[in-house]
């Protein structure tokens, strides 16, 4: 049985990608992209998964601006709290297992955009 493990977490909106460097202007109205490197728990490597973390207010403003928001691969939280957000993500990732890495990655891609999502090998 293969189990997933987070190898690293980045936030793409900050130059150094360090989540500790990200401080939203409004903790109850923000949106940012988490880049997760996730792989099998028994190996060093991983693959990239991207997840938009945002608040309902941020979604509302995006809807006001554009009239709509695509909803796939979003984690919606009441306010920005890095510790809580990280715990939510880790709990889901740690719960994913399967007979192959493709099975596990498929489960992870339910909540985050997998770098190989939609890829069909020959």
Task: Tell me the role of every PLM-derived stretch.
Residues 94-122:
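C-terminal charged interaction modules
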Residues 2-97, 101:
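Short helix/strand-capping turn motifs
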């Amino acid at each position: 049985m293969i189990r997933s493990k987070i190898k690293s977490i980045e936030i793409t909106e900050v130059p150094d990608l360090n989540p500790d460097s990200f401080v939203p202007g409004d903790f109850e109205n923000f949106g940012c992209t988490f880049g997760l490197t996730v792989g099998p728990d028994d190996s060093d490597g991983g693959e990239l998964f991207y997840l938009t973390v945002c608040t309902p207010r941020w979604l509302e403003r995006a809807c006001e601006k554009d009239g709509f928001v695509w909803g796939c691969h979003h984690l919606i939280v009441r306010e920005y709290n890095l510790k809580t957000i990280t715990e939510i993500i880790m709990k889901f990732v740690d719960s994913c297992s399967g007979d192959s890495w493709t099975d596990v990655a498929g489960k992870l891609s339910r909540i985050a955009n997998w770098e190989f999502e939609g890829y069909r090998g020959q």
